[in-house]
């Protein structure tokens, strides 16, 4: 089905206010969920909203909490999210990293005691729109087996890198082949995954999203490489924030909350003039996209460039929402 941005935001806002969230916070949170969905990231927008409300009702998320600065070391700051609303706090933390970068050339904010930030790409994009390189990542509860194991002991720990090119170039990727959100999107659409995304119960690689959702044997991106990246990203976020690791979140908490996150902004214009920056970026993009195609009907893509098109299409034609997901939200 199709809905407008206004319908989507109003539905989110209604549910948040009915759960006791104050009107200003509810409006800002609803706006972010709706913008994420409008951008085409349904897995971490509309599809994730019922799960967000579940955690709000369980007390994992404290809606009136505000992040608090703990330590300041020039370009580096350490903050405690105090289990505040994840997407609103993440936006504030990237804003703070940008402020630090404006003074120092680079800014790094390490955040502990945080909640799920929904679409991580929003915060990299936020920096790139202002002309900064944006880098951020988060740890999570253990939802992926390390390479060679059957039991979940590491997080998908998504990493975002956004570059202020025209259009913005951005990688937004979990350390698994697919996020659990994208497994859900494909299952709801009745689709197999385009490539293997995990193991079935017999230990064979599979493209069936429902099987992987059930047995949790999701495949690390690049096999052992994604497994290793997940571990070191967790270590860095834990150390810099003095926060909880994947092990601590999984073993000590009843659900995924109290996680650790990193936000980095780099002011490129302190290092290179604007025309030179633009020319270098354009040469890179042109060199990549003019490579001989393996399939004449399939264009060579640059990461993140599709979001500009998706956003325009959703604004023109309405936002596609799965019927069952919309029914869940209406019932909240």
UniProtKB/Swiss-Prot annotation:
Cellular compartments annotated: Cytoplasm
Catalytic residues, chain numbering: 44
Recorded GO CC terms: cytoplasm
Keywords: Cytoplasm, NAD, Oxidoreductase
Binding, NAD(+): 168-174, 224-225, 304-306
GO MF: 3-dehydro-L-gulonate 2-dehydrogenase activity; NAD+ binding
Pfam families from the UniProt entry: Ldh_2
Reaction(s) the record says it catalyses: 3-dehydro-L-gulonate + NAD(+) = 2,3-dioxo-L-gulonate + NADH + H(+); 3-dehydro-L-gulonate + NADP(+) = 2,3-dioxo-L-gulonate + NADPH + H(+)
Keyword NAD (UniProt): yes
Documented EC number(s): 1.1.1.130
Keyword Oxidoreductase among UniProt keywords: yes
Family stated for the protein in its record: Belongs to the LDH2/MDH2 oxidoreductase family. DlgD subfamily.
Role according to the record: Catalyzes the reduction of 2,3-diketo-L-gulonate in the presence of NADH, to form 3-keto-L-gulonate.
PANTHER family, sorted: 2,3-DIKETO-L-GULONATE REDUCTASE, OXIDOREDUCTASE-RELATED
Assembly description: Homodimer.
Entry protein name: 2,3-diketo-L-gulonate reductase
Origin species: Escherichia coli O139:H28 (strain E24377A / ETEC)
Underlying gene: dlgD
């Amino acid at each position: 089905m199709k809905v407008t941005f206004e319908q989507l935001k109003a539905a989110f806002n209604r549910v948040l206010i009915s759960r006791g969230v104050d009107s200003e916070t509810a409006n800002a949170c609803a706006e972010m969920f709706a913008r994420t969905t409008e951008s085409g990231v349904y897995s971490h927008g509309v599809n994730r909203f019922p799960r967000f409300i579940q955690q709000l009702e369980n007390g994992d998320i404290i809606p009136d909490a505000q992040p608090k600065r703990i330590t300041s070391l020039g370009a580096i700051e350490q903050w405690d999210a105090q289990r505040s609303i994840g997407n609103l706090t993440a936006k504030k933390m990237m804003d703070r990293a940008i402020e630090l970068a404006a003074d120092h050339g680079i800014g790094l904010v390490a955040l502990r005691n945080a909640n799920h930030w929904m679409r991580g790409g929003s915060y990299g994009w936020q920096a790139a729109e202002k002309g900064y390189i944006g880098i951020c990542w988060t740890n999570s509860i253990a939802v992926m087996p390390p390479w060679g194991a059957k039991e979940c002991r590491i997080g998908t720990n998504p990493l975002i890198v956004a570059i202020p090119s025209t259009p913005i170039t951005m990688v937004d990727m979990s350390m698994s082949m697919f996020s659990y959100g994208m497994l859900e999107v494909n299952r709801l659409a009745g689709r197999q995954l385009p490539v293997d995304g995990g193991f079935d119960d017999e230990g064979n690689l599979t493209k069936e999203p429902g099987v992987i959702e059930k047995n949790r044997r999701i495949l690390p991106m690049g096999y052992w490489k994604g497994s290793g990246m997940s571990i070191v990203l967790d270590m860095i976020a834990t150390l810099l924030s003095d926060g909880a690791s994947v092990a601590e979140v999984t073993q000590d908490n009843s659900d995924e909350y109290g996680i650790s996150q990193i936000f980095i902004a780099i002011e490129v214009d302190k290092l290179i003039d604007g025309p030179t920056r633009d020319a270098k970026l354009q040469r890179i993009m042109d060199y990549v996209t003019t490579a001989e195609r393996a399939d004449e009907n399939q264009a060579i893509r640059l990461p993140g460039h599709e979001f500009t098109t998706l956003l325009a299409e959703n604004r023109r034609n309405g936002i596609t929402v799965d019927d069952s997901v919309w029914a869940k939200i209406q019932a909240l």
